[in-house]
Amino acid sequence: MSAMPTLVLHPGRVTLAELRAIAAGGQRLALDASALAGMRASQATVDRIALEEQVVYGINTGFGKLASTKIAHDRLAELQRNLVLSHSVGTGDPLPDGVVRMVLATKAVSLARGHSGVRPALVDALLALANADVLPVIPAKGSVGASGDLAPLAHLACVLIGEGAAQVGGRIVTGREAMAAVGLEPFVLGPKEGLALLNGTQVSTALALAGLFAAENVFAAGLVSGCLTLEAIKGSVKPFDARIHEARGQAGQIAVAAAVRALLEGSAIDPSHPDCGRVQDPYSIRCVPQVMGACLDNLSHAARVLQIEANAASDNPLVFTDTGEVISGGNFHAEPVAFAADIIALALSEIGAISERRLALLLDTGLSGLPAFLIRDSGVNSGFMIAQVTAAALAAENQCLAHPSSVTSLPTSANQEDHVSMATYAARRLLDMARNTAVIVGIEAMAAAQGMEFDRSLKSSPLIEAQFAAIRGRVAFLEQDRYLAPDIEAMRLWASTSAWPAPLAACLPSFQ
């Protein structure tokens, strides 16, 4: 068996492509050695303050509303342990494996920035867990996104102190067993170490990144399904003329129009009907660059925010070794992540909404010119009639889920923490939304492939024909009504892949 490739993490410079790879697993993570000096210096600063018994929040005080309570030096280890245990109050299903891998990696990166005052050994332990795929069991619910992701990160920290639970090879084991599996003894946490592990936006950021990556996949699938529909109804490519989009100047719109032109290059279908009498296609066809371009702009902006956050020191307080100061602030507040997740949600909803409208167009014989509901013997057969109902149901569900979460706030900790971001929920819903959108887009692509089969006298472009063949490799032509649920699931998986032609990959932030 060959050794896993090593991915070296450079704190402050981890890329989206690296984060996507971390989520997928299959590589060994290592920390850039240059980070060691900064971590040691910040740890020394914290140790000095603890010995001098200066009163500094997070080192020798209580937390939240109890921040004014001074803790004796001989109880600092107890303070940190109690912090971790008392905050392990999450509920709900465990986070997906890929999300937990990103949580481990981004927490290690954050601590390695040298502003948290923890031992390098703690960072090494986080990476050891990730490398062995020993994944802390982190309940998905229980964080309001300020002060950081306290409850879910406490469940991660529990494993480091031999408490809580982890997943090893599909089995659930105790935290102590998990540490033994990577050859480590549970930690006795030093001053500030428990707080540094709990404070931070790593869970909401990892969830938002998972949502971003899933959204990129269905965005690409949505462009392919749109091209398939265009070809099936013999629509016009004139609305994708570069001059139209350059006249407006929106970057995403220009990129999407270029991607569609590249996908359709070499098609024999469009040149075959220059004088068909159709003046303008419906908006769901004609305005693909405008709608999907706006979605791409949202995804690109969210990607920039999340890459910054994945590299951020989001602990509190922060240690500044050049002056020896430990300063309280609010980098744990996940408002940037909440906003990013909200605009990913808007994009996911719209990708599904316009796809569902194209699906409805395909099934309407008066608009598409194709057999009603894409079945030859309609009446006896219902064809894709109720598959469109499923798509409509999921599009409506996504429209409800897309309501901004960041506008919701409830005070906590006796009103000390009086404004929160709700970033964790904002990000957590994205995977559900992406799954819904993948089903919608998958149904459209399956229906469009069906529509193309009613006239195969001419071929589409090489890239679209390749996608047509990929679809036919998953689902057969619908000659008469059959059990469609397995076909819909097969097409959901098609729409969820990350293997897309170069013109699409060139649009997507995490593919760069």
Swiss-Prot record:
PROSITE patterns per the UniProt record, alphabetical:
PAL_HISTIDASE
User: Which InterPro entries has this protein been placed in?
Assistant: Aromatic_Lyase (IPR001106), Fumarase/histidase_N (IPR024083), HutH (IPR005921), L-Aspartase-like (IPR008948), Phe/His_NH3-lyase_AS (IPR022313)
Give residues where 2,3-didehydroalanine (Ser) occurs.
Answer: S147
Catalysis performed (reactions): L-histidine = trans-urocanate + NH4(+)
Describe the PTM. Contains an active site 4-methylidene-imidazol-5-one (MIO), which is formed autocatalytically by cyclization and dehydration of residues Ala-Ser-Gly.
User: Under the cellular component aspect of Gene Ontology, which terms does the record hold?
Assistant: cytoplasm
For this protein, what is any one GO molecular function term?
histidine ammonia-lyase activity
User: In which pathway does this enzyme or protein participate?
Assistant: Amino-acid degradation; L-histidine degradation into L-glutamate; N-formimidoyl-L-glutamate from L-histidine: step 1/3
- Crosslink position(s): 5-imidazolinone (Ala-Gly): A146-G148
Quick one: a GO biological-process term for this protein?
L-histidine catabolic process to glutamate and formamide
Q: Where in the cell is it found?
A: Cytoplasm
Reply yes or no: does the keyword Cytoplasm apply: yes
Report the top EC class in one word. lyase
Listed A to Z, the keywords are: Cytoplasm, Histidine metabolism, Lyase
The EC code for this enzyme is 4.3.1.3
Pfam families for the chain: Lyase_aromatic
What the record says about family reads: Belongs to the PAL/histidase family.
Q: Which HAMAP family match?
A: His_ammonia_lyase (MF_00229)
The name this protein goes by in its record = Histidine ammonia-lyase
